[in-house]
């Protein structure tokens, strides 16, 4: 089985933690590094959350801090969903893990430039780190095998009626990425909201056990409450983890090729991913957009990753 080399760019975040847990353990993924961006909370908080998850699950992958601010817009955070720390719910031991001294953007550029074009970028937060890397060193563009991202929607947004949070948090960065010419796969809300983590799913992961089962339970029990209060959902979708699922087995997720453009005009559609689902513009598709996911397969995959953390000695 081919191992997909990836850099996971995230803003932990509850669903980000599940994505880290899966990417670090599944044999089909070679997780080279974790880069952190501001998003669900400010950078100082998302960095601590990423380090806490890695320490608890004994994930020995380097962690790099990146962009603390969006490229242009005023910063926003999703404390309504992720709480004051950005990862409210779990209680972690005192943190001893440290981030690398290299800036995430430099790490992304250097790693891609030294590669054979076989590295996939997996940004599951605002696209600030990726866009700055592209602008700073355009020679990385042909080196990127693919970008598999969580963000956007071809239907309704979740932070405004038009826009999904990750794109709305830095629309200008998203515009850079979506016009880059790099092969894109977009897991938007239309797909990710199909992964609502209901109490029975949480109970299943608790039964699977181990440190990852415990962490999954603590994380997703918190989002049960916030997702219901904010969106009336029966649980928290694990938005970001769908990207890892896609990389492990693309057949589990149905996609459609579309031309996607990010609206950067100020107005009610600021930050919208405008997806030409019907092809009315006649422009060539630049993105594979997630449509449906086989949820039975997906939760089986999550459980497989959770079980991977159980110590057998």
Swiss-Prot record:
Family in the record: Belongs to the IUNH family. RihB subfamily.
Cofactor: Ca(2+)
Residues annotated to bind substrate: 227, 239
Catalytic activity: a pyrimidine ribonucleoside + H2O = a pyrimidine nucleobase + D-ribose
Origin organism lineage: Bacteria, Pseudomonadati, Pseudomonadota, Gammaproteobacteria, Enterobacterales
Residue pairs linked by disulfide bridges in the UniProt entry: none
HAMAP family in alphabetical order: Pyrim_hydro_RihB
Pfam families tied to this protein: IU_nuc_hydro
GO molecular function: calcium ion binding; identical protein binding; purine nucleosidase activity; uridine nucleosidase activity
CC per GO annotation: cytosol; protein-containing complex
Superkingdom of this protein's organism: Bacteria
Enzyme Commission designation: 3.2.2.8
Active site per the UniProt annotation: 11 (proton acceptor)
Protein name: Pyrimidine-specific ribonucleoside hydrolase RihB
Subunit structure as annotated in this protein's UniProt entry: Homotetramer.
InterPro entries per UniProt: I/U_nuclsd_hydro_CS, Inosine/uridine_hydrolase_dom, IUNH, Pyrim_hydro_RihB, Ribo_hydro-like
Cofactor info, note text: Binds 1 Ca(2+) ion per monomer.
Annotated keywords: Calcium, Glycosidase, Hydrolase, Metal-binding
Functional summary from the UniProt entry: Hydrolyzes cytidine or uridine to ribose and cytosine or uracil, respectively. Has a clear preference for cytidine over uridine. Strictly specific for ribonucleosides. Has a low but significant activity for the purine nucleoside xanthosine.
Residues annotated to bind Ca(2+): 11, 16, 124, 240
Transmembrane stretches, start-end: none
GO biological process, one term: pyrimidine nucleobase metabolic process
